[in-house]
Amino acid sequence: MLVLLAFIIAFHITSAALLFIATIDNAWWVGDEFFADVWRICTNNTNCTVINDSFQEYSTLQAVQATMILSTILCCIAFFIFVLQLFRLKQGERFVLTSIIQLMSCLCVMIAASIYTDRREDIHHKNAKFYPVTREGSYGYSYILAWVAFACTFISGMMYLILRKRK
C-alpha cells in the first residue's frame, strides 16, 4: 500500500510539474529563429515582445492563459486535498473530492490546448508583424507537455475516483 501511495503522489507531482512548465515556458510555437507562447514572442533569442491588448486575438490568448493557470492551481489544490483526505477519510471511503478537482484541472488544460490548436493559425496571420517567420515553425515542447499533462491529470483523476482509503 505504501508503494502505491508513493506512486500516486509522484504521479500527481509530475502532473503538476508538467502543468507549470507548459504554462510558464516560452515554447508553444517554435522555429529556428523564434520562440512564441501565450505570454510573449521572442525573435533571435534577444528581441522579446510581451503579448498585450494591442495584440489582435488577445482575448483568445487570454483564455488560454487563464485556463492553463486555473488548471495548474486546481492540480495543486487537488494534491493538498488528497493529503488532507489521507488523514480525514474513514477506511473504505473514496477520494471523490480530489478526483473531481483533478478532473476539473484536466478539463481546463484540455480547453487551453484545444483553443490554442484551433486558433493558432488565425493568431499568427492577424499578427504578422509579431510573427514574421511562423510558417517554418512547429508546435514546441510546452504545447506537447500541455497535452501530456492533460493525459496525466485525467489518469490521476480516474485513479483517485477508483482508489479507496485503506489502513
From Swiss-Prot:
GO terms for cellular component: apical part of cell; apical plasma membrane; cell surface; cytoplasm; cytoplasmic vesicle; Golgi apparatus; Golgi membrane; membrane raft. Disulfide bonds: none annotated. PROSITE patterns: PMP22_1, PMP22_2. GO terms for biological process: actin filament organization; actin-mediated cell contraction; apoptotic process; bleb assembly; blood vessel endothelial cell migration; cell adhesion; cell-matrix adhesion; early endosome to late endosome transport. It is a multi-pass membrane protein. Pfam families: PMP22_Claudin (PF00822). Glycans are attached at N44, N47, N52. The chain crosses the membrane at residues 1-21, 67-87, 95-115, 143-163. One of its GO terms (molecular function) is kinase binding. It is found in: Golgi apparatus membrane; Cell membrane; Apical cell membrane; Membrane raft. Keywords: Cell membrane, Cytoplasm, Glycoprotein, Golgi apparatus, Membrane, Nucleus, Transmembrane, Transmembrane helix. Its main location: Golgi. Functions as a key regulator of cell membrane composition by regulating protein surface expression. Also, plays a role in regulation of processes including cell migration, cell proliferation, cell contraction and cell adhesion. Regulates transepithelial migration of neutrophils into the alveolar lumen, potentially via mediation of cell surface expression of adhesion markers and lipid raft formation. Negatively regulates caveolae formation by reducing CAV1 expression and CAV1 amount by increasing lysosomal degradation. Interacts with PTK2; regulates PTK2 activation and localization. Interacts with ITGB3; regulates the levels of the heterodimer ITGA5-ITGB3 integrin surface expression. Interacts with P2RX7 (via C-terminus). Interacts with ITGB1; the interaction may be direct or indirect and ITGB1 has a heterodimer form. Belongs to the PMP-22/EMP/MP20 family. PANTHER family: EPITHELIAL MEMBRANE PROTEIN 2, EPITHELIAL MEMBRANE PROTEIN-RELATED. This is Epithelial membrane protein 2. The gene is EMP2.
